[in-house]
């Protein structure tokens, strides 16, 4: 079964802004002693916020983007590189929010084989492709990042009885 035909995950794992900040800071702690890094590369769009937090915590100012498109809502499709990075990645720290099936990570690894690849969250299928991660979630879990959800009105429980 390929990624485009995979069934939707069975579980949702909502992540708040506070949790994402805490987990991204924990990632920075793990990366602190592994440097020094010449720069950070955020894999867009999911890696932008974690990369900003890691850059702050590691006191790094050089942040670039690797623009990759693979998801359309909850369906992973063909991977398109919209903006690459020159070189082999030596000295670079790549940051993404999540490694899922590993398809995006494989493309990134091919482009920047000497970079250190770090994600906040990792699923089992993609975990071997990253060097550092903070939180593992099961393959059948869909992570709901705070930029993908919004609060909305929920009627009181008692109103359902009327």
Where are the regions a protein language model picked out?
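PRPP-associated nucleotide enzymes
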Residues: 1-162
């Amino acid at each position: 079964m390929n990624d485009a035909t995979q069934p939707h995950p069975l579980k949702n794992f909502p992540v708040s802004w506070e949790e994402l900040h805490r987990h991204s800071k924990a990632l920075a702690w793990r990366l602190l002693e592994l440097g020094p890094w010449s720069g950070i590369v955020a894999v867009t769009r999911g890696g932008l916020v974690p990369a900003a937090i890691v850059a702050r915590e590691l006191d790094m100012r050089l942040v670039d983007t690797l623009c990759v498109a693979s998801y359309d809502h909850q369906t992973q499709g063909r991977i398109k590189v919209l903006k690459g990075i020159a070189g082999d990645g030596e000295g670079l720290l790549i940051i993404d929010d999540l490694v899922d099936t590993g398809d995006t990570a494989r493309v990134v690894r091919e482009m920047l084989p000497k970079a250190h690849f770090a994600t906040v969250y990792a699923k089992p299928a993609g975990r071997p492709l990253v060097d550092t991660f903070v939180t593992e979630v099961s393959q059948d879990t869909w992570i709901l990042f705070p930029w993908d959800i919004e609060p909305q009105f929920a009627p009181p429980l008692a109103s359902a009885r009327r």
